Amino acid sequence: HWYYEEPDFERYTENLSNSCKHLTRVIYDDNTTIKVGGSELPDSVLMGINTKEFGETAELKSGLNDEHWYNYLNSIATVSNGVIISSNLAKKYDLSVGDSITYARYSPMKTKEPVEIASPSGTICAIVDAWPGFNQYTYEKDNSGKVVEKERYLVVANYAYVVSAFGLTPYQIWGQLADGHDYQE
């Protein structure tokens, strides 16, 4: 078993309040398995977000999705197990708003076989072409040393639901810089 104790988030907000307008916690796990029917998609991305904080902090260029991305945040804000999924996932499995998927996370402890922590279900509330912090494609070397493109899939869920399903977990802190400040400060 592994144990994680959450640091005091207020300490970060106090230390960064001069240089950042907004801060938010983001659970980012690129080792999530998405399950649809009998199929599994390993190495998918799960983002656990607080919708209000995330909307105030992150940015996304207009015109990349059918609607403004705030509408997608609003769609999961009132559905505790609501999820936003990437359009490539929806296309691969012919998924629509209202359908359900399951996503699994694994223990960070190194073992011979991955140990699944939990596998909650989520109700699809929105489908997006683009999302802050998500790259649909990664590039890696195969066994022969050739660089190959690998497609990834996204699930965005409510932060509180992710924590209730998987327990406390390390998170990233995302910030939006205040006017007149840069990332090197």
Where do the language-model regions lie?
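Short proline/glycine-enriched turn/loop segments at secondary-structure junctions
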Residues: 36, 112-113, 163
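A cross-kingdom feature strongest in bacterial/archaeal respiratory oxidoreductases
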Residues: 133, 137-140
